[in-house]
Every structure is written in structure tokens, then in C-alpha cells.
């Protein structure tokens, strides 16, 4: 995860998978379920998961994450349909199949450029397909999700 010259980058300061994906291991000594999952989750889900596993009361309307307890009980569950990642002026929406990033100009919130990677064919994120007409509908859909769910993050509120 340190971008050892992948994408000509060094260290963790990009929106590429090499910077944003981390291994996640959860051990629950009370559970008999063992295994791994490909479920899409986010690190903001850890605190709600710990609260849920310990049967503590969740703070009302304060947590953005969701408990991973259902996935821990059944690793075949899908997890989230997307996760949001922000790194400086890059705003990324990741799904199972795609990684969509918009780089936004802070002064007027205009889009500087976009990146779209199709993880079904390019897990290493080497080929930006944002300019390919075959992906126009995907870009529209991901752009809509990004701006309708995370506009306050984009505008810096």
C-alpha cells in the first residue's frame, strides 16, 4: 500500500487503490465463523462494528459507518454498494466494479478532470476509461451518486 512507484507515485497520497485499500482483519473470539470476504466496506465501519459486537448503545445520528457484524456472521454478504474516499481535491466513489474520481477546483467546485477505472478488466488501475464513450452511462450514474450523497464533502462544509 505504499505506491512503490505504481502510477509513478510514492507513499499514500493518491486516490488509487494502492493508497486507499488496506487489509482488514477482525477477530471475534466468541464467533465460530471463520473466513474471508470480498465485501465492500470502509474503515468508518469499524467503530459501529465494535459497538455492535459489544452490545453497546450506538450514539444517535453521529456515525457515518455501519456495523459489519452481519458480514462477520455471513461472509457471503455483499457489503456496501459503494464507498467514498476523499484525498485533498480528489473525490472518489468505489464500487465492486469501478473506481470513479473527480478532481475538483476548490474555488468554484468545477471539475478539473475525471478518472474511471473498470476493475473487471483493470484491477491495477492503469487505464483511465473516463473518456471512452462506452462508459458514459457509468460516469453519469457514479457522478450522480457522488454529488447527491457527498456534496457537503465536495463543497467543504
Describe the role of every protein-language-model region.
Residues 4, 34-93:
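Polar, surface-exposed loop/tail segments
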Residues 23-24, 46, 68, 100, ...:
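Generic structural signal for small/hydrophobic residues in well-ordered secondary structure
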Residues 15, 36-43, 57, 61, ...:
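Aromatic-acidic/polar surface patches that form glycan- and anion
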Amino acid at each position: 500500500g505504499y505506491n512503490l512507484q505504481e502510477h509513478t507515485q510514492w507513499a499514500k497520497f493518491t486516490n488509487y487503490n494502492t493508497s486507499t485499500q488496506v487489509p482488514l482483519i477482525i477477530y471475534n473470539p466468541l464467533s465460530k465463523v471463520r473466513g474471508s470476504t470480498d465485501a465492500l466496506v470502509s474503515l468508518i465501519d469499524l467503530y459501529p462494528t465494535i459497538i455492535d459486537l459489544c452490545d453497546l448503545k450506538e450514539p444517535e445520528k453521529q456515525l457515518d459507518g455501519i456495523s459489519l457484524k452481519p458480514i462477520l456472521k455471513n461472509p457471503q454478504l455483499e457489503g456496501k454498494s459503494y464507498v467514498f474516499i476523499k484525498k485533498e481535491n480528489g473525490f472518489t466513489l468505489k464500487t465492486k466494479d469501478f473506481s470513479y474520481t473527480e478532481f475538483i477546483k476548490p474555488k468554484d467546485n468545477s471539475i478539473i478532470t475525471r478518472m474511471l477505472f473498470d476493475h473487471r478488466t483493470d484491477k491495477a488501475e492503469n487505464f483511465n476509461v473516463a473518456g471512452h464513450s462506452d462508459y458514459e452511462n457509468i460516469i453519469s450514474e457514479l457522478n450522480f451518486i457522488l454529488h447527491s450523497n457527498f456534496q457537503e464533502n465536495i463543497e467543504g462544509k
